[in-house]
Amino acid sequence: MRSRVGDVDESVSTDEPSGLRSDQDVALRRALLYVILPLWFVPGIADWVWHRQTKIERTAGTFESLTHLLMKTSVGIPIILTLFFDINALVITSMMLGSVVHEGISFLDVQYADGRREVSPIEQHTHSLLEMMPFMATLVVVCLEPRQFASIFRLGSERPRWKLEAKRPAISLQYRVGLLCAVALFVIAPYTEEFVRCLRIDDTLKPHRTPES
């Protein structure tokens, strides 16, 4: 029977998301789970700080803040899928599309902010990191399941799997809870706060009252 990433390797802790084919797979998984994903929070929270320092609510305003929420969503959903479901054609495609959508919204974000809000060199470097992270994560996932990636383009002998399949064995509960808590604390909370702060000041989105005659 074919050995694949989803098969169980009893020599490896269940902290790993699924079975392993080689030491390279172990290294790739650990790079994704313990390096790429945790480090992703650093430029994310730094970018929020730069927005706050330049008073986004009084400059570029609600529209730019909305693009930030859309970018987080475009890559957040595929990442969540990789934590709970086997890596297959569906998950890989969602990550690729999410990365492309994130890049497109990022371009729109910078284009809109230009001339409305000061974007310092350090913020530009922060943006570069944020744009690179989704593609890095996607590349690691593709390397872990190259046959499913190839099957998307009708290459190789493996059929693409286009349904969500629960991970066997699952990533440890502690890791998933910890990462989701970090997402809530360092992504959802600050960027929701930013959006609400912009809404409170943006008069264009408030309902206009008809003057009483």
Locate predicted features.
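Helix-coil boundary and interhelical linker segments in multi-pass alpha-helical membrane proteins
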Residues: 9-34, 78-93, 140-159, 166-174
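Transmembrane alpha-helical segments that form the membrane-embedded catalytic/substrate-channel core
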Residues: 41-50, 99-113, 182-197
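Membrane-proximal helix-loop-helix units in multi-pass membrane proteins
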Residues: 92-162
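Transit-peptide-like, low-complexity N-terminal presequences
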Residues: 1-26, 30, 196-213
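Membrane-interface helix-loop junction between the first two transmembrane segments
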Residues: 45-65, 198-202
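Core segments of transmembrane alpha-helices
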Residues: 69-82, 129-139
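A hydrophobic membrane-anchoring alpha-helix module
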Residues: 166-213
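Juxtamembrane helix-capping/reentrant segments at transmembrane boundaries
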Residues: 57-70, 120-125
